[in-house]
Amino acid sequence: MVHDAAAQGYQRHAAAYQRGRPSYHPDLVALLVDRYGEGEVLELGAGTGILTLPLVAAGVDVIAIEPVEAMRTTLAERVPGAIVLAGTAESIPREDRSVDVVLASQSFHWFDAPAALDEIARVLRPSGRLVTVWNVRDEELPWVAAYTEVVDRHAADTPRYRSFDWRAAIDGDVRFTATDDWEVANPFPTDPQGVVDRALSTSFVAALDQADQDRVAAEIAAIVEPLGSSFDYPYRSELQAWTLAG
């Protein structure tokens, strides 16, 4: 199952997604490789490969699952060393007990959690790990708060990281035990166009008609104009992990 906002927005604006989204902190990538990089790693909702690329470069065997064709095409072009497949978290195209780690980077909030957790439990080997990874913006800076206010006008009922419904669903599933919770500041060097691209890559903004997208872009450009030609977009990179009962 793919939410309409994701299906429409990401299909139309995969390029903006790739330009506007931050990479993950090198320490987070190193931690993933060290603690979760052994065996087969299945990445759900892999997008354009923002996390897939450094994992494969570090020698991790990644099976990347992505439902949106435009994102999947970009992913396959950018990361030829990954196995790239069409699929969803609710219908994973892998055999029972076939992978060691299931990874969801910036994606678990999109899933139908009960159905996805059933599928994740099915494809994981006993004592396999479920790992979620996120880049989360720091809302304390006034310009970031202003950015969020503009973007969130269009959110409606779109699933969001900040609801934490995704985490409650995992923590409430008795098959999974929380084992890791880690974060690091991850300032992302950017420029005014990069922040506009970040806004346009937001699923529900990308699904708007062109006139509304243009209005969002103009408002965001006005917010960041005083920041100059280059500046940091304040993020933190987060990782949470759970172990499947063996």
Please give the residue ranges for each predicted region.
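A short, conserved alpha-helix within the catalytic core of class I
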Residues: 111-119
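Class I SAM-dependent methyltransferase SAM/SAH-binding core
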Residues: 48-91
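Conserved Class I S-adenosyl-L-methionine
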Residues: 168-246
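Conserved catalytic/acceptor-binding region of the Class I
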Residues: 118-188
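Residues lining the SAM
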Residues: 100, 104-105, 133
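A short acidic, Gly/Pro-enriched loop at the edge of an enzyme's catalytic core
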Residues: 90-101
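Conserved class I S-adenosyl-L-methionine
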Residues: 1-37, 39-45
